[in-house]
A protein has these predicted regions:
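C-terminal cap of metal-dependent C-N hydrolases
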Residues: 301-302, 310, 381-388, 393-394, ...
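Acidic, glycine-enriched loop/beta-strand segments at the rims
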Residues: 36-48, 364-375, 380, 422-428, ...
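Histidine-rich, glycine-flanked metal-binding segment
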Residues: 36-81
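Bacterial N-terminal signal peptides
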Residues: 10-22
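Divalent metal-binding pocket/active-site signature
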Residues: 174-232
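Polyanionic/metal-chelating signatures
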Residues: 122-130, 145-161, 187, 208, ...
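Divalent-metal coordination cores built from histidine and acidic residues
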Residues: 73-78, 82-87, 94-185, 204, ...
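Bacterial N-terminal signal peptides that target proteins for export
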Residues: 1-12
Length: 510
């Protein structure tokens, strides 16, 4: 079979010569002496992989040929490239095409357009990436909040009318026609927080009719978490399409310890035939805007702020990662800032939120970002180990949360190797074949002949994250080499000058 596939590639070259077409480059690469983890979760096998062009041609005990570029893996693990199902790389990818925080984790494909916000129109974003490619592959969802802003105007806090919903549905159709994977929502953020369930369901149904998928930052990850879980289950039930919970978490003290109950509920939904899944990053603290903690959006509501301090994020666990009105606050906890201001933590939170709002109104730019420590380690482990949870970063290219540079190596080095939460094979599965399945990608995520040659070579004994809240951009160690579409973009821990990334469009149909 491998010989026939190789012959096919070489016949293409001869055909190109006959027709005067450009000659494709056959970047034949043979990787030998590798412990191959194919992404399925099966035990690793010692062997070799041959790459021809952008595809995996053969897997097994292969003999080098004179035309091969030989790479000796020296016993390291060779796995499929990692797929980041929840990425904010779109915020800076057009100006940071090397995508260093992703490549150095072994990530070869990012899925952007998350939390209800996407580049608009996607056609232009995709064209820019095709004209000047990045190092990584990119796929995208359509953002519900982006559609809402386009139809209703920014700052609108009303429920959409039937006419406005239809206008959103029309724009959604155009974006899906551009190749978007499906619809993303950020129902805890503005303006999604003001949408009705009917509005979201209508757009979800339109997405399902076109063969798309649904991913959601739930309407609440704390106060009204149970209702939010019911909402996404109902969307999956009514539409019949796959639905995914973004960065699944239990971000409130009263919810701590309830991961088994949640997973039982999700398993029951799956038994009913609802294709519900989740992604997760391996940290007990998140990053977002201050006002996401105040659903009424009132920075003067001291009772709501008191609840935040007691149940959602203790003052010592709130760290500011962006505060342009007073840049010296970056890296400090709320307790430290309150001390500098001679205020209580609650008073400081209220005042800082007001400053942030004023800055945003004046400049049109974000007034704050903060890290909040809200999750329990036991819940995190239970949710991560669920067979239908894949790994993500929820990070961008300039993310001051360590997840942006460390999520995947942290799972490999800490949770799989050191904590033995699951096997290395299972960890790789949660980073490759499982996310590919959740996204409907048919030719990525496994080491298998005919699949795209997105690969990562790493040392299972040393791989680990190094990024911290104080040094969030420290690259991981233990990731040696990375290939994207058959081209090496990282060699011996150093990036190459290649930019072979592609736009990955939805190919599924109703």
């Amino acid at each position: 079979m491998g010989q026939r596939r190789e012959l096919f590639f070489r016949l293409l070259v001869l055909l190109g010569l006959c027709l005067g077409a450009p000659i494709p480059t056959l970047a034949d690469t043979l990787i030998v002496n590798a412990l191959v983890l194919d992404g399925t979760g099966s035990p690793g096998q010692r062997g070799s992989i041959r790459i021809i062009g952008d595809q995996i041609s053969d897997v097994g005990n292969l003999t080098a040929r004179a035309t091969d570029t030989l790479v000796d893996a020296q016993g390291l693990v060779l796995s499929p490239g990692f797929i980041d199902t929840h990425s904010h790389a779109d915020e800076h990818l057009l100006t940071q095409r090397n995508a260093a925080p992703k490549i150095t984790q072994g990530i070869t494909t990012v899925i952007v357009g998350q939390d209800g916000s996407s580049p608009y129109p996607l056609k232009n974003f995709f064209q820019a990436l095709e004209q000047t490619p990045a190092k990584i592959n990119v796929a995208a969802y359509v953002g519900h909040n982006t559609l809402r802003d386009a139809v209703m105007g920014k700052g609108n806090r009303e429920e959409a009318t039937p006419s406005q919903m239809q206008s959103m549905a029309s724009l959604l159709g155009s974006e899906l026609n551009s190749g978007a994977i499906g619809l993303s929502t950020g129902l805890e953020y503005e303006p999604g927080i003001y949408s009705s369930r009917a509005e979201v369901l209508l757009l979800a149904q339109q997405t399902a009719q076109r063969g798309g998928r649904y991913i959601s930052h739930l309407r609440s990850e704390d106060r009204w978490f149970e209702d939010s879980i019911e909402e996404i289950i109902e969307i999956g039930r009514v539409t019949g399409m796959p639905v995914q919970i973004s960065h699944i978490k239990l971000a409130m003290k009263r919810l701590w310890g309830s991961a088994p109950v949640l997973l039982k509920q999700l398993d029951a939904a799956r038994d009913e035939g609802i294709d519900i899944t989740a992604d997760i990053y391996p940290y007990t603290f998140w990053q977002s805007h201050m006002m996401v903690l105040l659903p009424e959006r009132d920075p003067l509501d001291m009772s709501a702020i008191d609840l935040v301090m007691r149940e959602l994020a203790p003052p010592e666990g709130i760290i500011f990662t962006h505060f342009p009105a007073e840049p010296s606050y970056v890296g400090k906890t709320l307790v430290e800032i309150a001390g500098l201001r001679n205020e209580s933590p609650g008073e400081a939170f209220s005042q800082l939120a007001q400053q942030s709002i004023a800055y945003e109104e004046k400049t049109g730019q974000s007034g704050d970002m903060m890290i909040g420590t809200s999750m329990d380690e036991g819940d995190l482990r239970d949710l991560m180990a669920w067979p239908h949870t894949n790994i993500c970063t929820d990070g961008g290219l300039q993310d001051r949360h360590p997840r942006g540079a460390g999520s995947f190596p942290r799972v490999l080095g800490y949770y799989a190797r050191d904590a033995a939460l699951f096997s290395l094979e299972s960890a790789v599965h949660k980073m490759s074949a499982l996310p590919a399945q959740h996204l409907g990608m048919k030719d990525r995520g496994m080491i298998k002949p005919g699949y795209k040659a997105d690969l990562v070579l790493f040392d299972p004994a040393t791989v680990i994250d190094r990024a911290t809240t104080s040094e969030p951009f420290l690259a991981a160690v233990g990731i040696s080499d990375v290939w994207v579409n058959g081209t090496r973009v990282m060699e011996n821990g150093h990036q190459t000058e290649a930019y072979p990334g592609r736009v990955v469009r939805r190919t599924s149909t109703p």
